[in-house]
Design a protein with these regions (language model features):
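Transmembrane alpha-helix termini and helix-breaking/packing motifs in multi-pass membrane transporters
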Residues: 155-176, 356-372
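Structural signature of the two symmetry-related core transmembrane helices
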Residues: 78-93, 176-179, 283-297, 375-378
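Helix-to-loop junctions at the C-terminal end of transmembrane segments
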Residues: 63-76, 164, 267-281, 365
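Hydrophobic core of transmembrane alpha-helices in multi-pass small-molecule transporters
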Residues: 22, 103-120, 228, 308-321
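Intracellular juxtamembrane helix-capping segments at the cytosolic ends
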Residues: 118-133, 241, 321-334
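Cytoplasmic helix-loop-helix junction between adjacent transmembrane helices
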Residues: 111-151
């Protein structure tokens, strides 16, 4: 099972940039729940917490594809000043919460932080695409990065919850750790020039101008729309679980329960990447989305937190394989000089979905409690199924034209 992973991590510089990428991606699992807990504690409003999260992720969605397009042209170090701006804005948000500033101050800082962060996951996967030669190796690498995402989502929520709910520490301590990880991890990753994909330069800019826009790629559109709704599922789920744990008198267990999703996903990611699958990518994708919806639909019937935790672990086993396949679909279907942009569109739509799901679930929970949040999770999960199955023919046609080796 481990030989495939050992082989790719032995590539020059591979282990180092993957580790740096993991540290740089830690904020994605910490900022949302840290912000939610801190704002709810200081402002007593799930709605405001949802608004801050939504603004962060919508700002990310507005700028990330543009930044990714520039990265494909000018190289990954193009991101350094933007990431530093993101870190400074996050510090501003921490200060605003600490001194109970007007909500507008939080929203402005959140917009800047999200709008300048870029997609670190896309940068890491672009390095793997540049470093590796065969589709089988890339499949293993993308599964590994999905597993690394889940490591972040196991450690991050638990760490954030422990920090924020520990009385001697400030309620912003989770955000403080997150911004530190972002700064250190990003600079470590971007300083590794040996594995950085070569900048395409002005010639690539002219070539991109003459190409069809990446969003005219049918496979990317179907995959991105499905990920948009799945992101809504994840955003709603995060808030619903925090609300459920709070209603049961165990708010401090929120991070541990959220980590159950990631634990199941991590196990599935490692298994999925250890072998080669003979099903067509489009079939793997639509089946994965369907299984994920079936599992997510059980949460609305949860009588207690034990049920939520077990259902989360089982449902989570569909997450990493589904998103590994989604990234493979994009990697196979877009042009080589559009890979970073294509992969970023997936993370962009996921984050937009998370923001919308968080906001809608926050409203539902303020009105109907945790049950309303889990109802939002169920609706979004089956909407994703409808989109994936409706686009299966487009996926098959687009991938067939590209002729996967």
């Amino acid at each position: 099972m481990t030989s495939n992973y050992v082989n790719i991590l032995r590539k020059p510089g591979a282990f180092k940039f993957s580790a740096a990428g993991l540290l740089a991606r830690m904020p994605m699992s910490m900022v949302s729940i840290s912000s939610l807990l801190a704002i709810q504690s200081e402002y007593h409003s799930y709605t405001l917490a949802g608004q801050v999260s939504a603004v962060t992720l919508i700002a990310f969605a507005c700028t990330a594809p543009w930044l990714a397009r520039r990265v494909d042209i000018y190289g990954q170090r193009f991101m350094i000043p933007f990431i530093m701006a993101s870190c400074l804005a996050m510090v501003g948000e921490i200060v605003s919460i600490t001194f109970h500033a007007h909500p507008v101050a939080l929203l402005v800082c959140a917009a800047i932080a999200g709008g300048t962060s870029g997609s670190m996951g896309a940068l890491v996967r672009a390095r793997w695409s540049n470093l590796l030669e065969t589709p089988d190796e890339i499949h293993t690498a993308f599964a590994l990065e999905a597993a690394m995402d889940e490591v972040a989502f196991i450690v991050g929520p638990i760490l954030a919850t422990m920090l924020v709910t520990n009385p001697p520490l400030p309620v912003t301590s989770g955000l403080i750790v997150a911004v530190t990880a972002q700064a250190v991890g990003s600079l470590w990753f971007l300083s590794q020039r040996a594995t950085e994909p070569p900048a395409k330069g002005r010639a690539a800019a002219q070539e991109q101008t003459g190409q069809s826009h990446v969003l005219r790629n049918g496979a990317l559109v179907v995959t991105a729309l499905t990920c948009l709704v799945l992101g809504g599922l994840f955003g709603a789920n995060d808030v619903a679980i925090v609300a459920s744990a709070t209603e049961h008198g165990h708010k401090n267990l929120s991070g541990a329960i959220l980590a159950c999703f990631s634990t199941g996903s991590l196990v599935a990611a490692l298994i999925h990447g250890s072998r080669q699958w003979h099903w067509p990518l489009q079939r793997q994708f639509v089946v994965g989305v369907t299984v994920l919806a079936l599992g997510a639909s059980t949460l609305i019937f949860a009588p207690n937190l034990w049920f939520v935790a077990v259902a989360a672990a089982i449902t989570g086993m569909a997450i990493a394989p589904t998103f590994t396949t989604a990234n493979q679909i994009v990697q196979h279907s877009v042009a080589d000089n559009q890979i970073t942009e294509g992969l970023t569109w997936l993370s962009t739509t996921i984050n937009v979905g998370v923001s919308v799901g968080t906001f809608l679930a926050g409203l539902a929970i303020d009105n109907s409690g945790a049950h309303g949040g889990f109802l939002a999770v169920t609706v979004m999960s089956w909407l994703a199924v409808v989109i994936a199955w409706s686009g299966a023919r487009t996926l098959r046609r687009t991938l067939g034209v590209r002729q996967i080796p």
